[in-house]
Each structure stands twice: as C-alpha cells, then as structure tokens.
C-alpha cells in the first residue's frame, strides 16, 4: 500500500473512479521493495513451464543429481494451473492435459522426457496467445470490479518482468492513466500497449576511469590506448563527451563532460533501468576478462555511474549502480531482535554463548553480500549466511535443514506479520485507530501490544464495523480489511493461509537452491531474477534470526539443536491440531488469534 493513493486524492488527480482499485494494486505490486520481497508469490504459468523444463533438462544432462527441485517445481506448476482463471476459460484442453501429467509421480527417465516434450509444445502454443488472453481477462475484471483483479494484475506484471521490464519503469507507466489521451482510452489500451511493446535501442555511457596496469615497458598512456583497443574488439567504443554529443541528437548535454572519456555500450531494452542493467552485465563480462589478464586493476560495479540515452525517442537519465541493484533494511537496531542478539553477541560475559559464533558468522556473510554490487557475490554470500545459521547435525544435508527450518520459522509469526503490515497500510492511508470506546496508538513502541490490540478490534462486534468504515477511504485497503477479517475470524481461512504460505516458501527455497547451484557449478545467473531473489534471501534471513534469538531468550537456551527443534515442533503442533477432526479449532487457535504468534510449547 502506497502513501498518497486514497480514493479521493486519486480522483482529484484525474484518475477515473472505475480504475481506482487497479491503480492502487498496480502501484503496490510495482513498489520496488514489495516486488523484490514478495514476487515469488506471483510466478506465472509460462515462467513455471520454463523453470520445470530447465530443471528436467539439468537432471537429464547430469548437472543435478536429485529430484528436489523437479518435484517442487512440478507441485508449484500444478497449483498454478489449478487456480489460473485464464487457463480455465481460454485453454481448457491444454489445462486438462497438464493437470493429468503433473499429477503423476515422475519416477522414471522416460516419464521425465515425456513431460519435457509435452511442456515444450504447450509453451509454444501459450507463448503466442496467453498474454493476450490474460490481458483481456484483466480488463474484464477491472471493468466489472471483480475480486480477481489482484491476482490477475500480479500475473500480468510477472509476465512484463519476464519480458524484461523493470518494476520501477512499470510503476511510472500507471500514472499515464491520470492524463489524456490514456485516461479516455482506458485500461485496455494501456495494458495491450504495454504487453505488446517492442524493445528500444539505448546507448549507455560509463566514464572510462579504469586503472590500467602498464606492461612491456609501455607508458601508462600507451597502455591505456591498448586497453581502449581491447574494449573496441568487444564492441565497446570509448568516446569523449563532445564526440557523443555529435552523434546523439537530443542528449542532455548537462549530463556529459566535454573532455571526459566514456565507454559506450549499445543495448536493447524496454526501459532505462533494464538498459542500465544489461549494459552493466555487458561491461562486467569484458572488464572481468581484462582484470583476469591484469590489463586493468580489479574494479567494482559500485564505482560505475551511467548515462542512459534512448536513441529512438531521445530521453536521458543518469543512474548509479545502487539505483538498479538496491537492497533494503529488514531489521533495525531499535528492535527487540537487536536487543536479544546483542545479549548473545556482547563480549560482556557472553563470549561462551553457543549461538554467538553462529550469529557472527551469519552476519559477516550478510555484510559481504550487502557490500557487493556483483549479483553473483550478493546472492552467494547471503545464501551462505543462511546456510551457516541453519546447519544442524539433526538433518542429513544442509538443504534438508533449510527446507525444514526456514518455512517453519517463517510461519510462526506469519499472522503477526500480516497484522503489522495491515496497521502500516492503515497508517499510510491516514487511517487512525480512534474508535467509539477506545483508541490505539499506531506508533507505539511495543509492537506485540499493537498487534494484540488490533486483532481485538477485528474480533469485537462493536469496533469491527467502525474499522471497516475507516478503511473505505482506499479501495485496496478495504479489500485488505475484508481479507484480514476472514483470517482473524474464520479458523479454516487462517489454516489455509498459513499452510499455503508454508508450501510457497518451501517451493521457492528449492528454486533459490537451484539458482545457488547454477552460480556455484555452472556460472549461470538468471540476471534480472537474481536481483529480486537476493531480496527474498535477506527477508528469510532476517526472519530466521528473529525466531532463533526469540526462542533462545524465551527458553533460556543457547543450544541451536534445541532451538531448531522448538521452532519445528511449534509449527508441527499447529499443523496437527488444524487437521485433528475432534479439535475445537476456534479454541485451539484462540492464542494465535490473540497475539498473532504460534507459541504452543
């Protein structure tokens, strides 16, 4: 939920009333942190097919030796197809065939090959027709005000990102709906134009400030010219600012320095951010090669600033690497998590705390990840940070430990997190928790109390209608209120929500493990995907540290094995109780509906 997107304000800025919910959803999903942290929840059918084919081929080629990722991706794709309304309405026969095939266990090489062939022909049929069908479905949902808008918009944005759009660029696109002629043409014109867009040509300029390493008795200037020739052989020309102004008509001269030399990278992209990303990838390949052969000193992406110029419709934008590869803060030094971690790590009498070295090692790798601008380094170091904390002698392998512990840990306070997020959404929409019989300080430092009091409002038959009325100021906030009301009053809705989250996280960890292996063993990187996948790992690590330190403090133990066992058993107790036929579910879930935290043991 973004600040400044309440209904009244948007209508005043020119947005049509029937476009309010769509615009609010679009802006939330394309907010960088929201997308980078939660994108794994909106994987689309075409992406899922590609991933499963990739996993199968990797296994058949001998690059992987277990069925972990194949089984996880098969289950995920099966779930995607079951709930995809586009497949139901437009491609029922393809849907039926896939449901039948994906429901079978892949217990032989021949079945793997058969499924691969089937997925490939299905992809070829969907590739040319799915996007148009999805767009029509989304337009219909917007026009009728259907509840499916959120899921369909998430699928649509996921498809745009798969094509190569950056979410920052997508976010800005929606603002055109406030202006003519896009306002009059409506969302159908806006959406079809975006999904059918063609890549444009960009020239990207990076200052030539490399430190050369002179050889063979050559002067520094002579060897600098040699490096320029090497760059040229890779298709990267070096030009001065004045030379660039000569062939780039319309470029903003203020962005260039006349005598400064620039490395010029030509690329095709949908927007300036993806153009910057692809140019950095291209530069990295060349500069890493030159650095390896000591033609230049080691370099860092963080040292690079870029001037991105659209050569087809003259537009100039200056960017730094941090504008493209940004990370976010998930925990801060004022939190209870920090206080608990400090007590464990502090040298004042706690040097022997069993958890101390585990946390320090994990923090060290997390810092290495944050400090790096190279995607491979960022990803691998944050993965190692999770591995170092999850490693346990109670599991056969490290990935078994991660796949068991992390989903369980992320579910223990999942409801708590949903409530916290709802309160923050209300705050961004200028909703105050002032009711007829009580008031809640939404900025109180005690977040546990804030969550408890907010849940109590939802479950109070007098206050709950007052809260709903306050949330009507923003269409998306009101929709979120309705979702939270169901979660906090209906036992089965809560159970389904938590279990779906657990399953989704487990599927995604398998995906992240595959990416980790490809970087480690094959040097393969999924480029744009790796940017957001790194954010998922930061989020997982922050939650894991929070749970480990919380259980250590609450149970006065430093034994990692005991803490892991407590985390796993708490989730499994919830799982078992939710399935017990004789269980009074409202009674069992009473504590969870009070604090938002699973604390059964």
Q: Which residue ranges define each predicted feature?
A:
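Amphipathic, oligomerization/interface secondary-structure segments
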Residues: 2-68, 335-601
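N-terminal accessory alpha/beta regions
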Residues: 37-141
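Charged, non-catalytic interaction/linker regions at domain boundaries
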Residues: 104-380, 384, 388, 531-600
